[in-house]
Design a protein with these regions (language model features):
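Accessory beta->alpha helical hairpin/"wing" motif in late/C-terminal subdomains of nucleic-acid enzymes
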Residues: 7-12, 58-80, 210, 225, ...
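Short alpha-helical segments that sit at the start of domains
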Residues: 1-26, 195-206
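Short acidic, hydrophobic short linear motifs in intrinsically disordered regions
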Residues: 26-44, 210, 214, 218-225
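Beta-strand-rich cores of mature extracytoplasmic or soluble domains
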Residues: 26, 75-78, 84, 116, ...
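Short amphipathic alpha-helical interaction segments
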Residues: 37-61
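Active-site ExK catalytic segment of metal-dependent nucleases
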Residues: 57, 76-83, 163-169, 177
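Long low-complexity, intrinsically disordered regions
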Residues: 99-289
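Short, amphipathic alpha-helical interaction segments positioned at domain boundaries
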Residues: 66-105
Length: 289
């Protein structure tokens, strides 16, 4: 069984072509050095040809080069100093704005009758550290997620080592009447919407969203600038993903970096700890499109 966990950022379903364990095991086998196509059996070559269509690998002169980065423990050791500096620079920006976040969280909490610290987590983690900063990076150093045939448009990366205890992301779904439903997801948490009779979650109207967007947009811009300038200090040629797709590499490092920062925010008491056991409504909210 493969030890890697894959993540994506964007829209679509990367597992559309690669739902079997055979893909994971093959990719782990050829990463990072690559492999001569002639050394693979027929079923493995079929997987490689599928991977090539969605730019997971590059096949040139009968040699297979893996293009999706995988983060390993040796990689972590080589960028640990970078992560520490990155964390410090991110925290400087967050501390500069945190009172504004507390104030807005308090305002929304009073209106929604939802705990203030929960609203604060949504504002800082979901809107700012994740979606807001990623949006700014897509306007700059990242560009838009690459098209992967009919499986969607997304960045993709894998991890063999989880350096953060609080890795998270945000998924958004459309619901009727011009509303959007969002949820903070974490890999270790499995949710089921079956047999749920009611949910107590915040609903952000257009007036609230205007305040939220104004706050996270400016903060995310600063964080994106920190990431973009700091990434230049990483010696990519020394890492396992040196020859992988640069966009996927940058997206991976962005997600690893902000999750690392999240741990620090929790340790310092700025953020409440993510629950080990959650209700089905934790990390969910509805907002105007």
């Amino acid at each position: 069984m493969s030890e890697f966990i894959f993540h994506m950022a964007g829209s679509g379903n990367w597992r559309k072509y690669f739902s079997s364990e055979a893909f994971y095991l093959l990719y782990e086998r050829i990463y990072p050095e690559g492999i001569n196509l002639k050394k693979l059996n027929g079923s493995d070559r079929d997987i490689i040809y599928k991977c090539e269509k969605v730019a997971f690998v590059e096949v040139k002169d009968n040699f297979v080069n893996p293009k999706i980065p995988l983060f390993t423990e040796p990689d972590y050791k080589k960028i640990e100093k970078w992560l520490t500096k990155f964390e410090k620079d991110y925290l400087k920006v967050i501390n500069k704005h945190k009172e504004e976040y507390y104030s807005l969280a308090r305002l929304i909490s009073d209106e929604e009758k939802i705990p203030e610290e929960y609203i604060f987590t949504i504002l800082l983690c979901a809107y700012t550290l994740d979606a807001g900063t990623l949006e700014k990076l897509e306007d700059g150093i990242l560009g838009r997620p690459p098209s992967r045939e009919d499986s969607g448009k997304y960045f993709l990366w894998g991890e063999k080592i989880a350096i953060s205890k609080n890795y998270f992301g945000v998924n958004t779904y459309e619901i009727p009447q011009n509303k959007l439903f969002s949820v903070i997801w974490m890999p270790e948490i499995r949710r089921s919407f079956e047999n749920i009779n009611s949910l107590t979650i915040p609903v952000f109207n257009s007036s609230v969203m205007e305040k939220i967007e104004k706050l996270y947009s400016s903060t995310s811009e600063e964080l994106a600038q920190v990431f973009s300038s700091s990434i230049e200090k990483i010696k990519l040629n020394e890492l396992s993903f040196a020859n992988c797709s640069l966009k996927d590499v940058f997206c991976m490092l962005f997600h690893i970096g902000y999750s690392y920062v999240t741990d620090s925010l929790i340790e310092q008491g700025i953020l409440s700890d993510f629950p080990k056991e959650i209700t089905d409504s934790w990390g969910m909210w509805i907002w105007n499109k």
